[in-house]
Every structure is written in C-alpha cells, then in structure tokens.
Amino acid sequence: MNVFWFIPTHGDSRYLGTSQGARAADYDYFQQIAVAADTLGYEGVLLPTGRSCEDAWVVASSLIAATKRLKFLVAIRPGISSPGLAARMAATFDRLSNGRLLINVVTGGDAAELEGDGVFVDHDTRYEITDEFLHIWRKLLTAAHTNDAIDFEGKHLSSKGGKALYPPVQNPHPPLWFGGSSPAAHEMAGEHIDTYLTWGEPPAAVAKKIADIRARAAAHGRQIKFGIRLHVIVRETEEEAWAAADKLISKLDDETISRAQASFSKMDSEGQRRMAALHGGKRGGRAELEVYPNLWAGVGLVRGGAGTALVGNPEQVAARMKEYAELGIDTFILSGYPHLEESYRFAELVFPLLPNRRNKVSNGPLSGPFGEIVGNNYLPKAASSS
C-alpha cells in the first residue's frame, strides 16, 4: 500500500471558505510539507495544476534539492503545451531528481479556464488530442534511450523527426497517472496510463470504475494499477474526528457554497459532476454528508476536484483504506487541513496500522522516533503496538 501526501499550492487553512485560520502559500511552507512527507515515509506528493494554484513544475523543481527520496506527481497539460516540450521537461526533471518524477495527465474539465489558456475544443476532442499527445510523448522519451528520432501524424498533432536528446532516468519514461470518469477518459486510460486515479467515491462506484478500466486495458494487452485521491480527518477517537470535520466547514455560509457550486456546474467534467452529486450542494450534518461509513462529502461543498474525506479514529480510517485496497487500489493520495500538521498526525496514527508501513522510516538509535529523553538519562517506554 503506497501513501502519498499533497502540496497545497492553492492555499491552506484550518477552515474552508474563509480567510480565518489561513496561512501563506509560499515556498517556505511548501518546503516544510515536502520535507515532512519525505521524512515521515510518504512515497510521494501530488502537486495540483490550473490557474488556482502556483505552477506545479516550478514548485516541484524547487523541492528536489530539499528532499531525498520523495517522488513528485506533476501534471502535463495536452492542448496547452506541446508533447515535445513536455517530453523534454519530464526528462530533465527526472534526471535532476534521479528518477523521482511521476506524470499526472490532466486534460482539464473547466471550459472557462481552458478558453482563458487558448483551448477552444469540446470534451471528446480534448481526449482525442490527449491520445495523440501521449503517443508522441511516449515515443519521444522511449526513443531518447537509443538516440532515435520519431515521426507521428495525427488528426490534431504531428511530429516529424522529433527527438529528445537527453533520456529520462526511468526507462522508457516516467510512469503516467491519470484521472477521469467519462467513457472517453476510461478508454484513454486503458490504452496509455500506468496508474488510474479516482476521486473518493463510495467503494461500489470505485469497483465499477476499476472493472471497466481493467477490461479496456486488457483489450490493449495491458495491465494497469489504481489509486484514489482522498482527504483525511483522523483523530484518536471517532467523536473527535467528526467534531474536526464539523469545525472544518463551520465558517461556511450558504452564499459561499452557492457560488462554489455554480462555478463547478459550468464544468464539463464527469468526475466533478459525480462529486457534486454526493452532497447535492447543500450543507448538512454528518447524517447528510456521510455518504458511506467514514466517507464524508463536506470538503466538496467549496473545493473543486477531490471532495471527500475519510473521517474517523485510526482503526476506522485504516479499515476503510483496506476496503478500497481489496478492490484493487494500491496508492492513496491523501491530504488534510492544515497540510503540515495533518501529515504528521496521519503518519503517527495510521501508518502503524497499514500493511508494509512500519519500516518506511529509519528507526535507528539516533533517529528515533522515541520522544523526549526522560530524566536526562532514559529513553521513554516503547508504545504498545496493540
């Protein structure tokens, strides 16, 4: 089971929908979160993309030297950048980080934002462009290992004598990740993607996605891995966790929720539509927003994209993660508000309950973790593992 964290380059806070409890989204803060994730044993971090956040490539590049083993899941944007430029950027990043790059393929689902970036095509055409983009991108980086040139002629994109002179460390190229819920997205994932990402829908819905994409991948003679993107609110007791969930949205008013939902409704993203359907755009208590045991839709009232959180005590959160893992999910990309503190909280409370997590961080005599020395002489008693 792989666990990733999240760099909140669009801002961070203790509350949603208000400046109260907010903190500056600046380099020092991003670095603190990245170093924490690296030290605590998270496999990697996701960096968001779009006009609502800082540029993912610039931020991720700035964090390479601050980390040792952390992987970076960074977006390429078919339709906005050329496949040749994206291939060179990926190769350089992979070389400078010694193979720590993962690629998040983002077609985009907000027509207003896409048009602002100069992209004026409909939903299915975006996926046609993405398909051709990935054919070129993959061929360029694969050919870079043998110093060969490539040709490709498509309906939307072409390359004649394309060449990447510097190959990536990962062969043939950094792994491709992607999330999308439409039939066109599933077909594209089946043909090109190494790890398919879903937002945190209830297990039955996730199982249907996995089955469909596995079948599409098999039709292309491929196998594919699966990941899920979720927020997490974990506390030592269930009561504390649900109180924290209520507190997170306690500053929201109806106007803020309405404005956010109106913005989301203009998108042509099937995934965003499915997120909105979980809460119906209406604030409520646990009874209204707990859409499956320990799965809470409150975040999606004002946050685009991933809008659900696992809420509960450590055992409940771990049990729900294991339930998703039994469906075929092997990577969990998590986040919590505020992101620095919650990266520690989750690692401390839940990592010991997950398979293959105990030895991710060195526990040698000088590195701990063992707590503050007692009486200037003794290590604290070891915590019970039961």
From Swiss-Prot:
Biological process annotations from GO: alkanesulfonate catabolic process
Catalyses which reaction(s): an alkanesulfonate + FMNH2 + O2 = an aldehyde + FMN + sulfite + H2O + 2 H(+)
EC annotation from Swiss-Prot or TrEMBL: 1.14.14.5
Sorted UniProt keywords: Flavoprotein, FMN, Monooxygenase, Oxidoreductase
Top EC class of this enzyme: oxidoreductase
Domain of life the protein comes from: Bacteria
Cross-referenced NCBIfam families: alk_sulf_monoox, PRK00719.1
Family according to the record: Belongs to the SsuD family.
HAMAP family: Alkanesulf_monooxygen
Protein name: Alkanesulfonate monooxygenase
Species: Paraburkholderia phytofirmans (strain DSM 17436 / LMG 22146 / PsJN) (Burkholderia phytofirmans)
